[in-house]
């Protein structure tokens, strides 16, 4: 039965005598856009071997060296730098500074006082001790300021001059007398009213708080003992009595605990203003 195919006796592959002409639209779309033969003939891609990335060996961690415990006191200045050039400049400019203080007193403002004076007048007085201008400088400072300002200046020396206040044992008698004089000025004649009395006690607390953190801080008990003994003697010589408070409470046995003096002469009640363990 002939179904439209021509049969041949040859050994060759038979050819299609009548091509299919009625392709559907789907077949045409599939034949045109997709070559199934090419897909079947294309060998599957072999997965590429992933070469491992080079591994950098980690350096062994060095054991951390724990720093040896040191007394956290302020560093000493090198001997060659203790007579810095600013001392000569201070001497040369002291008259101008005092003139500025006079202007500030007249207008009741400190805006005309050189800014660096606020932070460095105590070290300046140390360098100028014995100079005829030093006393005038101190008197102008005292008269120009309220008691609060005096204590603020006492308690905040300039950062680059902190080497002068290296440890309590390095305080000179002149420096201690300066502080005693400031306390005396506060105590004398300014405790007639409750308001001024409160201001006095607050200022004294600020002063001793600053001294406590300024000099030596912790772990220098021996230095503090010597400092407060000399401070107490200087106060006694000036007629200002203080009491060294070393109470026997249980928490007083903690390490690095220091006891600052109680100023009985000023009848301090604002204990929270002072870093004192009672």
Swiss-Prot record:
Compositional bias of kind Basic residues: 58-68
Spans annotated as Disordered: 1-23, 41-71
Name of the featured protein: Uncharacterized protein ORF48
Taxon lineage: Viruses, Duplodnaviria, Heunggongvirae, Peploviricota, Herviviricetes
